Amino acid sequence: MAGLQLMTPASSPMGPFFGLPWQQEAIHDNIYTPRKYQVELLEAALDHNTIVCLNSGSGKTFIAVLLSKELSYQIRGDFSKNTKRTVFLVNSEKQVSQQVSAVRTHTDLKVGEYSDQEKTQCWAKERWYLEFETHQVLVMTCHIFLNVLKSGNVSLSNINLLVFDECHLAIQDHPYREIMKICESCQPCPRILGLTASILNGKCDPRDLEEKIQKLEEILRSNAETATDLVVLDRYASQPCEIVLDCGPYIDKSGLYQRLLNELDEALNFLIDCNISTHSKERDSTLISKQILSDCQTVLLVLGPWCADKVAGMMVRELQKYIKHEQEELHRKFLLFTDTILRKIHALCEEHFSPASLDMKFVTPKVIKLLEILRKYKPYERQQFESVEWYNNRNQDNYVSWSDSEDDDDEDEEIEEKEKTETSFPSPFTNILCGIIFVERRYTAVVLNRLIKEAGKQDPELAYISSNFITGHGIGKNQPRNKQMEVEFRKQEEVLRKFRAHETNLLIATSIVEEGVDIPKCNLVVRFDLPSEYRSYVQSKGRARAPISNYIMLADSDKIKAFEEDLKTYKAIEKILRNKCSKSIDCGNTESEPIVDDDEIFPPYVLRQDDGSPRVTINTAIGHINRYCARLPSDPFTHLAPKCKTREFPDGLYRSTLYLPINSPLRAPIVGPPMNCGRLADRAVALICCKKLHEIGELDDHLMPVGKETVKYEEELDLHDEEETSVPGRPGSTKRRQCYPKAIPECLRNSYPKPGQPCYLYVIGMVLTTPLPDELNFRRRKLYPPEDTTRCFGILTAKPIPQIPHFPVYTRSGEVTISIELKKSGFTLNLEQLELITRLHQYIFSHILRLEKPALEFKPTVADCAYCVLPLNVVNDSGTLDIDFKFVEDIEKSEARTGIPNTQYSAESPFIFKLEDYQDAVIIPRQVIYRNFDQPHRFYVADVYTDLTPLSKFPSPEYETFAEYYKTKYNLDLTNLNQPLLDVDHTSSRLNLLTPRHLNQKGKALPLSSAEKRKAKWESLQNKQILVPELCAIHPVPASLWRKAVCLPSILYRLHCLLTAEELRAQTAIDAGVGVKSLPDDFRYPNLDFGWKRSIDSKTFISNQSSSSVESESDCRLNKTTAPDSAASSAANSVIYMQINDQMSVNCTPPCQKSLSHLQTVCFSDDYKAINGISCNGLTNGDWEAESAACFQKDERITCKQEIPEKSTSFHVQNLPKENQPILKECTLSNSDGNVSKPTSDECPSTCTSDMHYDSGLSNRHSSKTLGPNPGLILQALTLSNASDGFNLERLEMLGDSFLKHAITTYLFCTYPDAHEGRLSYMRSKKVSNCNLYRLGKKKGSPSRMVVSIFDPPVNWLPPGYIVNQDKNSDKWESNETSGEDVMVNGKIDEDFDDEEDEDLMWRNPKEETDFDDDFLEYDQEHIKFIDSMLMGSGAFVKKIPLSSFAPPDQNYEWRAPKKPPLESSQFPCDFDDFDYSSWDAMCYLDPSKAVEEDDFVVGFWNPSEENCGADAGKQSISYDLHTEQCIADKSIADCVEALLGCYLTSCGERAAQLFLCSLGLKVLPEVRKLVTNTNVISASSSYQNSTRDNCTLTARTNTDLSSCKGIDYGYLKIPPRCMFEHPDAEKTLDHLISGFENFEKKINYPFKNKAYLLQAFTHASYHYNTITDCYQRLEFLGDAILDYLITKHLYEDPRQHSPGVLTDLRSALVNNTIFASLAVKYDYHKYFKAISPELFHVIDDFVQFQLEKNEMQGMDSELRRSEEDEEKEEDIEVPKAMGDIFESLAGAIYMDSGMSLETVWHVYYPMMQPLIEKFSANVPRSPVRELLEMEPETAKFSPAERTYDGKVRVTVEVVGKGKFKGVGRSYRIAKSAAARRALRSLKANQSQVPNS
């Protein structure tokens, strides 16, 4: 037998490349890709009466249901008007309901079910008529139908389709037969479909079979069609070469074989003879023993003694377990007996051979033959095949797409990552063989594998084999599995995975692998035991599917004769079935023809006339077409293939027509030329088709299918010039950060007044609009409304300042509204006056505010941003404000101006107290008390205690009186012992007054309980700070003005930002034509506010609404009297004021606690739950419960460890040098949102801040709609959450994001009517990518205008007139010493007192003092460690700062990374997302809205040493100046662009937003060349037309406009003209195809004008009967974006004002495939769905059943699983993506049909979605993955994907210390979420058991 000739890949004439196993789904080159057999069967059944012979029941349902659906247009309508009906016949009653539910699930037809023969027998004709009238499909048993026919109740001519289930019964005497007899007499006869799965049972004679089939065909008057699963699987696939090998008998030379056999026989006989009486209940004691011994015997017979020895050894081990666990004596004895026998066998073998090495004498001839075959497959030495190509071929069936969304550009990286792990390449030796050996018994497989491995060690020829075995143990889908089987199961899947990945090249398997297991196409299949029946033969043969393969059957000599007979039978059966195979072409002959040079017959299609030019010949054309179809977009269930029909004409010529899948742009059938034979006709038509595809650009110039990156749409992808690459990180990502200068508004640039030049004087109006409510005024301080005193500040500049909205600052007295009003202009000042003013300006910033520091220099003439701040007062009785020169001069003269007057009092000239001097005073204690000579403390006098004197009792027991305290402690004698004492307050060191102190981030008030405690504290004397007037000097600046001065940094900063925003608004008006360039003089935007009022809980601070409004009105009047000229100058404005007061008086008043901006509170708002392990101790101290508890709402879990001992004093973070202060990223108000709920659609009522109801006083001509957005709203869009302001861009960004997607989608859809979804998707993802948006934003100059870090005047604010002095900067700071108690940092002494707590009471009660100096606070140990590590661990300050660390206050220091993390905490991984550096160096933050992939977010303490951005980024450092520059991540810029879009959308409507996008360079509207250049060309939509009365309107574009100069205008998108293809009888086809859809239109309450849209929305790519419209993919692409936008917009406008985090969660909960699919099923979309895809059919079937059982909607694919028990292999029920798709495509269809009306779509969809929106808004669902990662941020780790045996994906998540959890699903995402869900369930179960300690 040495001459065995096998066709091995290596020897094949086509060269070795062909048989590569990884040519898995080889694209056929000479025949069209075969379609699924069910599809072919359906086609046949539609064409003629058919008997379908199938293997499985499920396939039958598919064909029957789809056939009735296809023919349903014949049965819709009135029975009385001769409409027909469909009848399903079944054999028995119980099958009725199965059929009924199948038809009901997949169609909207009315189904009647009749199973009770008795009952129906007595029905009269009328009753039956009624049944036929009311139902369209009737399912009944055959007996009932026979009766109906016999009694003449209905005639067969009324029936269009008759389905016979189990039609093989018709051969016998059966009602089926009689029914068919009646049929014969009837004309026209209904269409007949017979279904049978049992035409082949066991062995049968081919002749009988043929007869049976013929007879059946006659009876049912049909053609039998067999499914290809009964013949070899692809009827086109090349058949394997079948070989039967006679192996000859085993010659037992040594006699060992016989001895072993005898031993086993005897033992078995003994066991059989043991006649132990077993009761039926008891188990048979000998059972296990018999089983083991007979298995051993089989191995001996089949494989020989060597293997018998091996198996005996294995069995002995297995027996030990049984013996150990066996309780019963008798059983045990039998087991021991068996054990002995096995040991004996082993001993016998050992005498003959050494078990270690394989001796060929002791194996059977079969094994030797097998090894011989395997040797033939030995590969040539190290052939390196280029198999990479295959792995990356995305349209292969087994290509796993990891990405579920096309739009995310971060996805690409991920895909690469994941693919790397998947494709472990085969070693060079596994690259040829891919084989399976089928054996019958499990043990045979195990031992044969062992033998092959052993042989490989000994025989170098076999060394290439890497084998494994798999037995059917536990692979069955539905058996219950125990733990041990589970382990088995896992192992087997691993085996299959390796075989699939070609890590092993030989699989030894039991017959289980014949069916249903997904394995690659093999090129060798060996039947070690002969197949015993046809089914087994076909199934194992069907595994040999590689293009060149061998199917070898090994036969023992004695069996070979009998088997040859069997084989003949099998062949004959196969032949009969093949003939019955639908449209079978006997392809044997075509393949065997020699390949002639057909070019002669039909010339090839050549691109260029040169030799190497790409060409398609008649022989390669079919391959090109197949490849093209495989690249069209489709889902995992559908493999698109061309359809070719060949007809023979009478003249003997053949002609083929080729139909491409319906989502190819080439829609018309292609008719080929007439040819001599069918094969050539097929090829010729393919060649013509290639030519056409190339002409329309579907094949590229290499004649390969173009990818989505197609050249054709190049213009859409004008990707900008490549980014500068010096910056590490991927453009557009969060990891890439760059520096930008901070913008300076044009009107403030170089605007320092010059002598003799005209100036503008603006007054800074300040009015207390919401006084601090009593509950918050803990110290019972008097409130000081700024309008009570006339002296105030003004701004002197050389340029006019545009009007900006009034805005609030929050002082100790409450909310103060700031206005900037022009006082006078055009006047001039002389040099002397200007110098005086300039000196005072510097004095304010350097002395009062102490903002001067070595790094800053005052050079008003050089500074970029320079204007003067100066005091104004009512001068010379005129009652108008003007510059207060007298006051300025007084200050210059005063000796207390800078230092402290050295007045000495003595007994002779004692101190004299004058009350009026102290009424409005700031006092400075004399040096003796405080050590700071250079920077003494300043105090406001809060109260004069006339009843106390220095002799009054001192509050703490150490000293008798105040006088004694000063004497003892400071050796001071007082000269006046009758003077009253002063109660003082610190002047404020908190300079960031942008947001109130007592509100948490959301504008929610802090709870009052803690307030009560504090009030008590402030009422006791002990906690007041008391000074003696004699020991203090009075400062020349009065307290009232000082209080106003403290507001200056916040006012000027806010002014600056608003002017920047206003400038952006004006710029956009020019570029985009949205809004006007300069605002009308009489117009002012409504005030800036934080939008909290509308989202406030009912629990506000003000108990009585009415009283507050009264109060505010009086404020307003007062303001009129005191400053008639300023804030309330016009009636219109006063109206605004009152309204604002009404609103503002609710609860936006600041308290008097410590500043939020310096983080005394650790706030986690609802959506940022605290995470275990952030230790808060570094952040707050004794005061912790008061403030931070206040920040947690009732329902929040606080999991911070509170290790902060209560102390009487409190350590303030303030006392750290500024840049060392820790801060919580989300600490202040970042979570709220300025623009609250302005609906974006035009007609909704406006409730938005930016358009508060101010029309009453303003003329209606102006609104943000016409003028452009409120600068306040623009500012919100420019503010990142890191800026910790009262608003940020997050909500607007989400709205902008979804509108952007919608605008671009609509544009692409309308502009490229021929592009299929894959291409549209690709173009969209490029346009909306962060990278693209970042580039556009950068081009527009957004980065400079953005507000990225917290406003901290001492650190990062440059006062007007100052410049940053670089040289001084570095010299000064490097030489500065960092030791000594009063370390100066930023020119601030570290004892910078907080305005609130009086740390330094000179006589404070010293509880267990760790006596630091008097005025240093006590720290607990934790704090000290914290501060030490902050100050010392950080090393010295140097000049550069590392990239991605936070900027220092000036650019000259850097943190050298601490050696260990500053807080004793584990090193958290740090996610640097959106972190803009500000001056905070110890950082702990969490911000889920900036989540990493899959919503994981990380909480971490920042540690610069760990930061790595790319390989070498760590080394590179960005050095920048905090005052004038800011460092921003690319992604933040992209976010800002989206937020600006959201801002234009909410203010000016959708058209304006589209124009804004166009002006950015994102084309979303078609360009129109302008012809007219006359003045006002209104380019706005009609809704603005009414505003044309007045020429300051909207987009009146004159020819001075930039855009007009370019001559470009933007038109409107046009709906693509055709949605139906030209087709001879299109209308008729359309009516057929959408028959029944009117019910659906009623259900959704929208009648389509153009029904073709409706059809298109429901047509799946696999549905080739629709020849008149496209499939739904394009509409789905459109609908997806529309629904996303509509839902996001709805959520954004929700009056509940969801925070950004909640908004994100809600959006992802509502806009996802699961929800859409569930809704689609709920509203019956699936019943109208048109698809021909068996797998999809079953998935939908399962899903619908599941939904019915569940009967309620699920969020976040939440509990989508069948049962709790199926824990181990929890597989989420699969959500058919197609269902979600048609939900979206219908939205797209309505949008197009209604003339692009979003309102119409929402009108249809809102009622469907409302219940869910309500349900989720009330209780926001989160994705399981995110929830798990929030619960276990440190310990949950997801594994990469593994493939399971049936081709699904498994993901394991390990929660360290709590277990591993697995999830399975069709994609990585589904599996991941299933795993997370199981982990959560387990963790939650454990939590509930362990009550929280």
Curated annotation (Swiss-Prot):
GO terms of biological process kind: global gene silencing by mRNA cleavage; pre-miRNA processing; siRNA processing
Species whose genome carries this gene: Xenopus tropicalis (Western clawed frog)
UniProt name for this protein: Endoribonuclease Dicer
Domain RNase III: 1249-1380, 1637-1795
Coiled coil: none
Binding site residues for ATP: 54-61
Reactions this protein catalyses: Endonucleolytic cleavage to 5'-phosphomonoester
Highest taxon in the source lineage: Eukaryota
Major subcellular location class: cytoplasm
Residues covered by the DRBM domain: 1820-1885
Cofactor note as given: Binds 2 magnesium or manganese ions per subunit.
GO molecular function annotation: ATP binding; helicase activity; metal ion binding; ribonuclease III activity; RNA binding
Domain Helicase ATP-binding stretches: 41-217
